[in-house]
Curated annotation (Swiss-Prot):
SUPFAM superfamilies: FtsH protease domain-like, P-loop containing nucleoside triphosphate hydrolases. Belongs to the AAA ATPase family. It is found in: Plastid, Chloroplast thylakoid membrane. Keywords: Chloroplast, Membrane, Plastid, Thylakoid, Transmembrane, Transmembrane helix. Lacks the zinc protease domain of other FtsH proteins. Also much longer in both the N- and C-termini. This is ATP-dependent zinc metalloprotease FtsH homolog. One of its GO terms (biological process) is proteolysis. One of its GO terms (molecular function) is metalloendopeptidase activity. It comes from Chlorella vulgaris (Green alga). GO terms for cellular component: chloroplast thylakoid membrane. Its main location: plastid. The gene is ftsH.
Length: 1720
């Protein structure tokens, strides 16, 4: 830091005058230089750690989020709007802001009316409807209180009167009697007290508001109405209402059945209802109870426990009634007499429901009103007096009206079907899998049971106890309490006393004191233990975070729960948790709980319950006799409100878009379908997500700040805007589910009372869209009120003849994201937009009064709607739980509850993991490219070397390493066939690799390098794989071509290969095509001494240093005299076309460096213990000798072509999978596949398998033949021979004259001639298959032929080769015999048929003459005595690159580029000249410019004077031969294009003509003598086959002395060609004679071939045997292959004559008689 400050001061002052400053400046410079060097060195040595960047990324993003959030809070505090948003708040759904939406799914759940709130303190208030029209009149009674609920966003405004509840001292039974059966007083009243009716009436004509519970009601029979849109026929589409059966829907408490709400108005009473659950007993009761002074109060944190008791068990009891979809229904006004198509949504058969009423706002209230209803009916039909069988109630509660029926169950929803309407017949059904939904709901709900965990302890003490198996405690706290109690209690009890029923022994100890019902001893013990072990409320959050099973269970909850059972337990009554569990729902006035009523299974003598025997009594009858306790323990608690949405109605109207006629004018429900749920297609995932987000108890909208922190530290201040006034509220007043809202320290006594009328919630169906598309041609098709989407609700008794149905349309608006402050508009209209494709809307929609939504940018309300907030300043995802408030106060504590989507617990970690995964994928996919760009940039700056860059690219994977690693090979020796001989040499390698970890003496003697040689496809690679599989070692595979890539270091890649091999040792390194890596090096010094690794390594490194080429320097000096433009032109030409010699030299340098690296790795300083090198090549002759010496490749294994037996084994091995026929001629296919490699045989069997699968058979002869043909040949065109055509009918024409038939016969005779001669010649290979239509050979066939020829001619005799040449001309000779009769027709012309055989015969003849020298010994001498045509090689021997340069320049001069253009132009002019009809004139001759170098040379040498150089002032030793002398001219370099050899005819010009004449005459005399000898030696009898052959005497050609030029090097070719022509002619004549002698056999083979088209060897053998047997026995041999001679005088010939006119006119023989001295 001190040095940095000094630097700053110096840079600011810039004063270096003083010595001190100068010294300080130098010191700073030194510090900078050393720091720069150290940092560079550190950066070079340090590795790139991308993980560090990834680890710091979440921290940086989180810090940025913190800064953005602080900025937003600061700007909001100053009243400014902040546009900045953090990364998390923008991208994560946890922090997204959503406006409250009212979707049509809201109406698909069970709703209940909005509870009212009182503004008075005192006794409980009862809310009842009234029929008074003028509600705003003054209060008539003193006890009446005006109730006015605050109006805020989404909540309707209700105004009504309430009355205090009756006095608690009133007789309970009398009140029940007056309430239940006072029919004359009016059924619409809720409570009759003191003969005064308390009413509440709607103040306006608006539709009453609804509030949807966060959970829907479970029901056995629940008909929902959903909406769907689909296309109809005739391009009609509409949204429709459909009823479908759904078995299960969740709720806060299973079994909850809120009743319908009744509101009286001018038009009638609105009554709707929803069914209940089947949860009660078999008895049929309808009892309403009222109690007083119930003081039990429950803690707030027990709500989850009571909500979910036995929820799963109730779900399991519910079954699907009807899985078929219900018929389509439309909510309409029900006709009076139309009952046939009426569908009634009736409740379940056995139901139980309750309803709570509360109205509380101030936390200091002490008295509340609670209503409890318990009812049970058999079915939807009303119960009459006959079905009412409760004798006890009949006595105590006499009926005042015998025709009385419980009207509470008669509220029905009238629905009329639309079966007769064809509009709905073809609609797409909206179906849902109710069974699957039921399974989903069962997984969502949490089962919480409270029972005793005494099973294990009780069984240990008394094995006879069996009733304990029904119970289990899941709460750890209760389990601990019970365990302590049970152990202490069992020690004190006598075990003999509990040998019977343990339950009965507990019941005997129950006591009743002071008319209060106490628990048994077990419960009392538990309460005592609870006092000792306290579970405080403030530990709930910690327990939830710690993962407790029941974090919401504390001491107060358990005490309340146990004390609650006092109301249901009496003396001699078994505790409910020891009996059969039957769910019973009760409302205690404190909090709704789930309890289990006792089931009195056993009758006991002398047991009474308040004087009434219990044997025939149900639990309700027991409760009716019980006098509830007047005093209980008081527990202070507060109930938090539950989230709830408020749906508001408005006066709206629908008008026709064209006529402007009002179709409907009245109340309606406004919806918004921007955010909806796809229940039909994604009900599984959507339902789970919906529950987790909106319904889960861990949702912040349900779990409030007080529950999270266990206390409310800071009071929230919210501001709610109303249309008339502004009020501040303590909290957002969301309707609570429970009837109490008390303060934490509040204590009160609860009055229980009866209520005859209950407000039921109703089921409100809806649709999703306001616009109904229709065609413009029929706009009035549905313009009536019946087709307006909405709902009809019956508001009176079903049997009431004056019932009224009110229709409420469902209208949809879309809420925009903008709001404007514009003056309020009393009335405005919002028109819907037209549909595309010719559709328009039916209605125009408008709203009267103040709208709830801003659906227009022009007309807007001044009201600023509240924003839905949750979890502090953040807003959660979309929900229909509306906290309709806007936080305007600062200093509000931000908190985040612990839930599944919490940022503190999960979001940050998940986002970090997500970011890490994304960045990891980016680094995997694009990291190499980015790193490559970075390295290119660094290399361009000069910091990174090119070689180092290449190494980094290989290490990072940007470039390929050139090898692959196979850690495991599945091939074994059993998977390879025909390698028995090779296995003996490879087993020792397997032994070495398997025992590489052991030390044995002979390990070093085993070969560490093996070279596999052989033709391609013989299985070298497969052999290495099998070896690796047997040795169980990895294999590193590389090829020479993969290392030799341009711009890369092959030596470095090879070094990486062996480094990897040493790490994987023991392993195998397999180098395929090793000849590309180790070709022979030229001009190398061979070491005649013993192997010296040090000297060889030094020699190899010395050879790597190649001298730089001087061609560039000489080229510059050569062109130094020319102009700059010419030089540039030549440079561009040199760039476009590189010098081949220079390029080859560079390639040679790379090749030598790669070979040297390979030699060093094979036998260098570094060892390769456990690494075995395998090399494979098919050209071992090109390998460098240094590679093949011992120590590198110790053993050379030749993998040749498989023999016949091995070929058969390979065919059988690959055919065993599919199978083959039993009579398969394997010997035939073994001979048929001569020359095939193992890979060829495998491919053959694969093709055969495909053919066999198509034929649905095994391998057959046909499939194998098909495989051979597909491998070796391709398709060819076929011609017909015997096809009947019109030419046969014409007698004048001959069928054989047809060209196609002649061609077919040509083919037949050609194939027959080859077949016959192969059997006639002794050493010629026999024909295996003859086809009439020969197929074109493929490249693979040529390779097979090459392999066969190479193996065949390794050792061959002269006679064998001669017969092969004769066999090559057999087909052509047979073709000539066939066409000899058609010489006059012109069809006997020579064809190209059999060109391949002729070419092979010519190559074979050249092989015999040039390589084998069978016929001419002079040819070998002449080839060795060749002379050099010029002295180019001698003069430029040290500069081979100039030879290529001069040859290229010479070609350019002789054939310049303009010459080709001139030729093209000349040819085009010639073509134009030949066109006689063309009227275009001839163009003038185009003049081409001379070459640039020619102009420069002529200007320099001829037309300009020479400019002699100036003399040198320096003394030169030899100025003539010194390059510094300006007058010195270097010697010329000559390149000769012509040959310097002379014509051999001019070599003997010095000889006289007389000598030539004498030599010629002597030769003629010698020929005459030899002719006489031959005439005497041959028989006078001519052969029958040669009679028809006419001798033709051609005129002698006259040659001049100067018409042919022949140099000495051409003499060897003449010497070769002369006997070659004679040998080919003699072979053809031999084939022609043999076929002519066996003409009958040839014709028979042709007939068979034309008939069968394909002849195989078995058929050919049978045909030959048949022809042999058909010959006369006088003839000794079927085939005549020898010319007949006169046996009178025999001469032992050694060499026959080539002909009288040939260079070998006489034969050579040995005269044994002359040798022996005998006379002839």
């Amino acid at each position: 830091m001190r040095i940095e400050k000094e630097i700053k001061n110096l840079l600011t002052t810039r004063n270096f005058s003083s010595e001190k400053n100068q010294t300080q400046f130098l010191r700073i410079q030194n510090w900078f230089s050393t720091h720069r060097l150290n940092s560079r060195q550190k950066n070079k040595n340090s590795e790139i750690k991308i993980s560090t960047f990834f680890a710091c990324l979440p921290l940086a993003l989180g810090f940025s989020c913190f800064l953005f959030k602080k900025n937003d809070i600061f700007l909001e505090g100053q009243g400014k709007a902040s546009k900045a948003s953090s990364f998390f708040q923008t991208n994560l759904p946890v922090f997204k802001t959503y406006h409250p939406k009212l979707t049509f799914e809201t109406f698909e759940y069970i709703v209940k009316p909005t509870a009212l709130e009182t503004q008075t303190e005192g006794s409980p208030m009862i809310f009842t409807p009234s029929k008074k029209k003028d509600f705003f009149e003054k209060k008539k009674n003193k006890n009446d209180v005006v109730l006015n609920q605050n109006s805020f966003f989404g909540q309707p405004t209700f105004v009504g009167t309430i009355k205090k509840s009756p006095k608690p001292q009133q007789d309970v039974l009398q009140l029940v009697e007056e309430t239940l059966f006072n029919k004359s007083e009016g059924i619409s009243s809720f409570l009759l007290a003191e003969n005064k009716e308390t009413v509440l009436e709607q103040a306006t004509k608006k539709f009453s508001g609804f509030s949807c519970d966060s959970y829907t009601i479970s029901s056995k029979k629940l008909s929902l109405v959903s909406s769907s849109a689909s296309k109809l026929s005739k391009s009609l589409s509409a949204s429709f209402l459909k009823a479908f059966m759904l078995d299960e829907f969740p709720s806060y408490l299973q079994g909850l059945n809120p009743k319908s709400s009744s509101f009286s108005s001018d038009k009638g009473v609105l009554i709707t209802k929803s069914p209940a659950l089947k949860v009660f007993s078999k008895k049929k009761y309808k009892v309403e109870v009222k109690s007083s002074k119930v003081k039990g109060q429950k803690s707030e944190s027990d709500k989850h426990l009571t909500f979910f008791l036995e929820s799963t068990k109730l779900l399991k009891k519910l079954t699907l009634v009807n899985s078929k979809p219900s018929p389509l229904i439309l909510f309409k006004k029900e006709a009076k007499n139309d009952i046939s198509n009426k569908i009634v949504l009736s409740p379940a058969q056995k139901d139980f429901s309750y309803q709570t009423r509360f109205s509380s706002k101030q936390p200091s209230e002490k008295a509340k009103a609670v209503s409890v209803v318990v009812k049970s009916v058999k079915d939807s039909n009303l119960l009459d007096q006959k079905t009412y069988k409760n004798d006890f109630l009949k006595e105590k509660l006499p009926l005042k009206n015998k025709s009385w029926k419980p009207f509470l169950l008669s509220k029905k929803l009238s629905i009329k079907t639309c079966v007769e309407n064809t509009y709905y017949k073809n609609q797409k059904e909206f179906s849902i899998d109710a069974i699957q939904l039921q399974a989903e709901f069962q997984k969502v709900f949490i089962e919480k049971k409270i029972s005793y965990p005494f099973l294990e302890e009780a069984k240990a003490l008394n094995p006879q106890i069996k009733t304990f198996e029904l119970f289990n405690i899941k709460n750890p706290f209760l389990k601990q309490c019970w365990s302590i109690f049970f152990q202490n209690e069992m020690k004190n009890r006598d075990r003999n006393g509990i040998s019977g029923d343990f339950t009965q022994s507990i019941l005997d100890q129950e006591k009743v004191q002071n008319n209060e019902l106490f628990l048994d001893d077990t419960s009392e013990k538990i309460l005592q233990n609870l006092e000792k072990v306290q579970v405080w409320n403030d530990s709930n959050g910690v327990r939830a975070m710690s993962g407790y099973i029941y974090p919401d269970t504390n001491t107060r909850d358990l005490e309340w729960f146990l004390n609650l059972q006092k109301t249901f337990t009496r003396e001699r009554v078994e505790p409910f948790f020891f009996q059969e569990k039957r769910p019973f729902k009760v409302n205690s006035g404190i909090k709704k709980a789930t309890a289990f009523f006792p089931s009195l299974k056993k009758e006991r003598k002398n047991s009474q319950l308040l004087g009434v025997e219990k044997t025939n009594l149900s639990p309700l009858e027991i409760l009716s006799k019980v006098s509830f306790p007047s005093r209980t323990t008081n527990y202070s608690f507060s109930v938090k409100p539950f989230p709830q949405i408020f749906i508001k109605t408005r006066e709206s109207f629908l008008t026709h878009p064209e006529t402007k006629k009002i179709i409907y004018d009245g109340p309606s429900v406004i919806l918004d379908s921007k955010k909806n749920f796809d229940w039909s297609t994604k009900h599984q995932t959507n339902l789970q997500l919906w529950f987790q987000k909106y319904v889960s108890p861990l949702n912040p909208l349900v779990q409030f700040q007080g529950n999270f922190f266990c206390e409310e530290s800071v009071e929230k201040i919210s501001q709610i805007f109303s249309s008339d006034r502004e009020k501040k509220r303590e909290k957002s007043e969301i309707t609570a589910f429970l009837p109490l809202k008390l303060g934490k320290n509040a204590k009160c006594e609860i009055d229980w009372f009866y209520d005859s009328e209950l407000v039921e919630s109703f089921f409100a169906p809806s649709i999703s869209s306001l616009q109904i598309p229709s065609e413009k041609e029929q706009p009035d098709a549905f313009l009536n009120q019946e087709n307006i989407r909405g709902m009809y609700l019956t508001l009176s008794e079903p049997e009431d003849p004056n019932k009224v149905e009110v229709f409420f349309p469902l209208l949809e608006l879309k809420q925009p994201s903008f709001t404007n402050s514009i003056k309020q508009s009393k009335r405005f209209c919002h028109k819907t937009s037209f549909f595309e494709n010719g559709y328009s809307s039916f209605f125009e929609f408008g709203v009267k009064g103040n709208p709830d939504f801003d659906f227009s940018g022009v007309f807007n309300d001044q009201k600023q709607f509240a924003k839905k907030t949750a979890s502090g300043n953040y807003r959660k995802t979309l929900s229909f739980f509306s906290k309709n408030q806007e936080k305007t106060s600062l200093f509000v504590q931000n908190w985040e509850p612990l839930n599944a989507t919490s940022w503190l617990a999960v979001s940050q970690l998940s986002f970090a993991i997500f970011s890490f995964r994304v960045l990891k994928s980016l680094s995997d996919n694009y990291g190499r490219e980015l790193l490559g760009y970075l390295m290119d940039l660094v290399a361009a700056l000069g910091v990174l070397d090119d070689s180092l860059k290449q190494q980094i690219q290989i290490l990072t994977g940007e470039r390929q390493t050139g090898f692959r690693v196979f850690l495991e090979s599945r091939k074994k020796f059993t998977d390879i066939v025909g390698i028995q001989k090779v296995l003996l040499e490879l087993y020792e390698i397997v032994l070495f690799l398997r025992n590489s970890g052991r030390n044995f003496t002979h390990s070093e003697t085993l070969p560490h390098g093996i070279l596999l040689t052989g033709p391609p496809g013989t299985g070298k690679t497969l052999l290495v794989q099998a070896l690796a599989g047997e040795a169980q070692v990895p294999v590193i595979v590389l090829s020479g071509s993969s290392l030799m890539e341009p711009g890369e270091s092959a030596a470095f890649k090879l070094q990486l290969v062996f480094q990897e091999a040493r790490q994987l040792a023991p392993c195998i390194v397999f180098i395929d095509e090793i000849d590309t890596l180790s070709s022979k090096r030229s001009q190398l010094l061979q070491n005649p001494m013993a192997n010296d690794p040090g000297f060889e390594s030094f020699l190899e490194s010395f050879l790597l240093q190649s001298k730089p080429s001087q061609s560039v320097k000489k080229t510059e000096s050569f062109f130094g005299k020319f102009k700059n433009g010419a030089k540039k032109e030549f440079d561009n030409f040199k760039k476009q076309k590189k010098n081949p010699a220079e390029y080859n030299s560079k390639q040679n340098e790379k090749q030598v460096s790669l070979l040297s690296q390979l030699l060093i790795e094979l036998d260098g300083i570094q060892g390769r213990n456990g690494v075995v090198i395998f090399g494979a090549t098919n050209r071992p002759e090109v390998l460098d000798p240094a590679l093949l010496r011992p120590g590198r490749f110790d053993k050379i294994v030749k993998v040749g072509l498989p023999a016949q037996k091995k070929r058969v084994e390979i065919l059988q091995f690959y055919g065993q999978t599919l199978g083959y026929q039993k009579t398969m001629p394997w010997a035939y296919f073994g001979e048929r596949t001569v020359g095939f490699t193992a890979a060829d045989l495998a491919t053959l069997m694969n093709e055969s398998a495909l053919k066999a699968i198509l034929n649905q058979s095994n391998h057959t002869i046909e499939t194998l033949e098909h495989g051979i043909e597909r491998l070796t040949t391709s398709e060819s065109e076929k011609y017909t021979v015997l096809k009947k055509e019109k030419e046969f009918k014409n007698k004048t024409t001959t069928p054989l004259l047809n060209s196609s038939r002649i061609y077919s016969l040509r083919l037949a005779y050609y194939q027959a001639g080859k077949l016959l001669l192969s059997y006639a010649l002794e050493t010629h290979p026999k024909t295996m298959r003859a086809s009439l239509w020969p197929r074109r050979p493929t490249l693979r066939s040529l390779a097979i032929t090459a392999n066969l020829e190479k193996s065949l001619f390794e050792f061959a005799r002269l006679w064998e080769l001669t017969e092969r040449i004769i066999g090559c001309y057999a087909g052509k000779a047979a073709e000539f015999l066939f066409l000899c009769k058609f010489s006059s027709t012109g069809l006997s012309e020579i064809s190209t048929l059999g060109l391949e055989d002729q070419v092979f015969a010519q190559k074979l003849v050249y092989f015999m003459l040039e390589n084998c020298h069978f016929y001419s010994k002079k040819n070998a001498i002449q080839q060795a005595m060749k002379m050099s045509p010029n002295s180019n090689l001698k003069e430029l021997r040290k500069k081979p690159e100039k030879l290529d340069l001069y040859s290229e320049l010479l070609n350019t001069i002789q054939f310049p580029p303009m010459w080709e253009a001139s030729e093209r132009e000349t040819s085009s002019l010639t073509l134009q000249k030949n066109k006689e009809h063309s009227g275009i004139g001839f163009e003038d001759q185009i003049r081409y410019s001379s070459p640039w170098w020619q102009e420069d040379v002529s200007a320099e040498m001829e037309f300009k004077p020479k400019n002699p150089g100036k003399g040198s002032r320096l003394y030169l030793y030899d100025y003539e031969r010194t390059s510094r002398n300006p007058e010195w001219v270097p010697p010329d370099e000559f390149y000769h294009n012509s040959s310097g050899l002379k014509d051999i005819k001019n070599a003997f010009v010095t000889l006289s003509d007389q000598k030539l004449y004498s030599v010629e005459k002597a030769t003629q005399n010698k020929r005459k003598e030899l002719g006489k000898v031959l005439a005497a030696g041959f028989s006078k009898k001519e052969n029958e086959g040669t009679k028809n052959i006419k001798k033709s005497s051609a005129p002698k050609a006259s040659f001049t002395k100067n018409n042919v030029f022949c140099e000495w090097n051409e003499v060897s070719k003449l010497t070769r060609d002369y006997p070659a022509h004679s040998l080919l002619l003699q072979s053809f004549n031999k084939a022609l004679v043999i076929l002519n002698q066996n003409r009958e056999i040839l014709d028979r083979i042709v007939v068979e071939l034309l008939y069968q088209e394909i002849l195989k060897k078995p058929q050919i053998d049978d045909l030959m045997k048949e022809l042999e047997n058909s010959k006369p026995k006088t003839e000794p041999n079927v085939f005549s292959t020898e010319l007949q001679f006169d046996a009178s005088k025999k001469a032992p010939f050694v060499e026959l004559s080539w002909g009288f006119q040939s260079r070998k006119p006489i034969p050579r023989w040995i005269d044994f008689a002359a040798v022996k001295g005998e006379t002839t």
